[in-house]
Structures are given as C-alpha cells and as structure tokens.
Amino acid sequence: MTTDAASAIGSDRTVDVILPTLDEAGALPWVLTRMPPGYRPIVVDNGSTDGSADIARGHGAQVVVESRRGFGAACYAGLLASTSTVIAFMDADASLDPEDLDVVCTPVVDGTADLLMGARAAQPGAWPWHARQANQLLARKIRRRTGSRISDLGPMRAVNRLRLLDLDMTDRGFGWPLEMVLKGAHQGWRIEERPVPYRPRIGKSKVSGTVRGTLRAGRDMGRILRELR
C-alpha cells in the first residue's frame, strides 16, 4: 500500500470517507464534487486501468494505491490511511450520494451509535433482483445471530476508527462488511441503520450487477458466517 498525500490531522469535526475504487473514472467526478464540507475523501485505487487515481487527485482527494485486489483489502488500506475519529465507507460508483453522509455519520459522531449503516432505499433499476434476494437472506441470518434489527448490509456506513481497528479485521474480500457487523455485535456495539437513497450506478457493476459477482460475494460471506460462529 502506498499513499500520495500526507495524512491530515484527525479531528472530531472531520470524517474521512473511504472509497474503494476499481475503474470508476466515469463516476468519481460526480461523487467527489458532491462531498460535503467536513468530509475528507480517501480514494483507494485497487488496480484501476482507466485513470481513476488521476481523476481523484484532480478533484482534491487523497489517493491510496492498494495493489492487493479485493474489496476488503481496499477498505483496510483506507482504514490505515485515515486519521479522523469517525470514518465512513461508501461505494465510488455514484449509486450513493455523499450528501447523505450526514444521515449515516451523525449518530456515530454524537456517540449514540457505534456502527451506523445506510439501508438502501432503491430506485428502479438500481438493485438487481439476485443481489437484493441474497442481501435479504444474509440480513435474516445476521438478525438471528446478533439480535440486531438490520435489514441491509449496506455499503454506506460509519464507525469509530479506533474501535474498528480493535476488531482486528482479517477478511480482504467481499466478507469485510459482514465481518465488521458480526465482530462488532460480539463486542456489544450499538448497531443501527438509517434509510439512504440508492441509485443506478454509473458504469458497469463488478459485483452485484452480475450473477457471478453476487455468487462470489456470497461465497466470501458464507465463509465469514462459518468462521465467526
């Protein structure tokens, strides 16, 4: 992992926003120009070949290059590069609007939640049926195992940075979001969710937009469910 920007000073008033990125040149300008004041984007380039890193730099984002491919690898690299007390994760494909970050981050900043996840309120065409069905099945398993009232393992989430580091996250694939929830619940975290709009993404999906990608994510999450019994 390498970074091309000096770390900013952590502050309770600033939230680092980690954006795992793989070939999102078409979406990044929209995402980064809508980043609200007080939110500092960290774009983790995970092997892009379309100039995503240069576009991110041109829009003022800190860029971290993570050569090991994998969603969890990119998230972990962003976590290590972040410095703020509270951090957020979100997709870089314009399916989520950075202007909704306040909805997800405020309860964690205020100390009323330890992990806040955005439950996707999907617009037509935003969420393929196979991905939605897989997500609903996974959410039911999480509810049974943790007692939480989670309806969606959503890609926009906020968490205290040091508490996340304490979880000793190990998954470097698509099991990362589930590992965070299960380990956090085991430690007694207050896990909540708020609805956020979910739009059709810009460009071609690498995961949920294909049956193959959904199956690959399901494989990783199934492994996490078995390992964290």
Stretches with model-predicted labels:
Residues S67-R69, A73-A81, E99-F174, P200-R212:
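Acceptor/aglycone-binding surface of glycosyltransferases and processive sugar-polymer synthases
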Residues D45-A53, A94:
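A conserved acidic beta->alpha catalytic loop
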